[in-house]
Amino acid sequence: MVSVTEQNLDVTDGYDGPMLEVNNLKMHFPVTSGVIFQKKVADVKAVDGITFQIKKGETLGLVGESGCGKTTTGRCILQLYSPTSGQIKFNGRDLTDISKKDMRAMRREMQVIFQDPYGSLNPRMTCGDIVGEPLKVHKLTSGKGEY
């Protein structure tokens, strides 16, 4: 059971397995034909059977050529896309069968940096401000000195 409150943020609840498990993840997007009567003619297999684990304390860099499914994989893990099939577990909890409210709380514990980090940085902010902003938004820090 996952317990998330403002005072007590405990998403692991004693779990000591892999932090993130992705098993046979697939995300297929339909290709349609026709203007009025759209008919599915094919699927684009953006992600087709990816499997990996990340243990606590590890960092994973998903690297590949443009259009190979890196961003789609991250969006599926965060449940911004509903995968076609597969299983995603975060600290032992299946994310493919979780309420939107619980998923919002789980996202506080996840971080995905999408493709071009330099394009996503605000030149008017310091690195500390950029890193600290999500901590402040999710109320995980009380002030600037903590990050």
Name these PLM-found stretches:
Residues 1-147:
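ABC transporter nucleotide-binding domains
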